[in-house]
């Protein structure tokens, strides 16, 4: 049976943006901007495992999206903050993202896991970035290319670190894994994760609940000195594929299930609903090559993970959520996943606004 759950939280994509051109699912091709050329691993994963074409985010932006993704809840205070977020933007990604009034009184999924005596590892969720220059005389946040060169081993100019936004996660959240910081490539996150996976294999133990923040499919838009949106999404796709491959080739695979969803769908469009999103259910006990059109949302993923790990619901929302029974089979297939390389250069950068010749686009 399943003993290990890996929960990947990504950033801000809708179903049609990524899978709209897939004929197997309910999509609209003219809304697809990050198709198979940019997201080959995500397309391969939904081909080999299940394509979820009727799954929705519970949140609409990061402030409530990360609360729904980790607590299955959004407080009354947070809902009323949508008038302008006067006190904080409580996504847990920085100093202004810390706000106890936004946190569910029932706690987070890791609190529920701890109460059951389960082991946990949290990579980046509710961890504030402390990315900085190694030279203290240098000021400001290092730009993407400096971080990219540090990841590639071409320099050691940048230090990748983070700190917990919530003190209770410190003991199981490595400071070397950076959560939200778009200057840091998702490849650096995948490298960190896979390095620790090797250590877990050497020890012969793996946590019951693993949470992984992979934020770069959020993109930096068309901001100068940042990768293009396609490069950002390709970065996240490759990192996700590499992590799944590593897990599928580990000794823990036979007792594992991987779930992934966007924290919110804010940045995109969809012909069914602005809340419809990309979601994944992966593992040896998951159906192969199936389309699952059962209606699920963020709380469905949490409810399924809770049932697998024997964790009671945190509140009425996950208690009443539909578990993802339709994704699973009693005929296990232990074949590993083979990731595929990116087609888009990960360091393809946005042009300067001055390079845009069309006066309308320049504005």
Annotated model-derived regions:
Residues 1-363:
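N-terminal pro-sequences and low-complexity stem/linker regions of secreted or lumenal proteins
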């Amino acid at each position: 049976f399943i003993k290990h759950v890996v929960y990947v939280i990504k950033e801000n994509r809708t179903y049609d943006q990524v899978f709209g051109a897939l004929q197997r699912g309910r999509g609209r091709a003219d809304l697809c901007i990050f198709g198979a050329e940019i997201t080959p691993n995500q397309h391969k994963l939904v081909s080999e495992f299940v394509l979820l074409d009727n799954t929705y985010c519970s949140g609409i932006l990061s402030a409530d999206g990360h609360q729904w993704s980790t607590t299955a809840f959004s407080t009354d205070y947070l809902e009323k903050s949508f008038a302008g977020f006067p006190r904080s933007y409580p996504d847990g990604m920085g100093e202004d993202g810390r706000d106890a009034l936004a946190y569910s009184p029932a706690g987070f999924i890791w609190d529920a896991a701890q109460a059951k005596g389960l082991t946990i590892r949290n990579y980046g969720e509710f961890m504030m970035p402390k990315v900085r220059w190694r030279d203290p005389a240098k000021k400001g946040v290092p730009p993407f290319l400096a971080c990219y060169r540090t990841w590639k081993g071409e320099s050691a100019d940048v230090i990748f670190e983070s700190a917990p936004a919530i003190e209770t996660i410190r003991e199981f959240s490595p400071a070397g894994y950076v959560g939200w910081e778009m200057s840091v490539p998702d490849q650096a996150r995948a490298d960190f994760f896979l390095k620790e996976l090797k250590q877990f294999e050497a020890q012969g133990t793996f946590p019951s609940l693993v949470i992984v923040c992979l934020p770069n499919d959020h993109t930096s838009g068309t901001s100068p000195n940042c990768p293009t949106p396609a490069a950002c999404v390709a970065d996240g796709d490759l990192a996700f594929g590499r992590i799944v491959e590593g897990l599928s080739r580990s000794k823990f695979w036979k007792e594992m299930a991987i779930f992934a969803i966007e924290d919110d769908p804010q940045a995109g469009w969809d012909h069914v609903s602005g809340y419809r999103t990309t979601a994944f259910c992966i593992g040896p006990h998951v159906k192969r090559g199936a389309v699952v059109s059962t209606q699920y949302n963020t709380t469905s993923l949490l409810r399924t993970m809770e049932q697998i790990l024997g964790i009671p619901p945190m509140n009425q929302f996950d208690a009443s959520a539909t578990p993802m029974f339709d994704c699973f089979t009693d005929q296990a297939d232990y074949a590993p996943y083979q990731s595929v390389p990116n087609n888009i250069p990960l360091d393809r950068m946005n042009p300067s606004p001055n390079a845009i010749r069309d006066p309308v686009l320049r504005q």
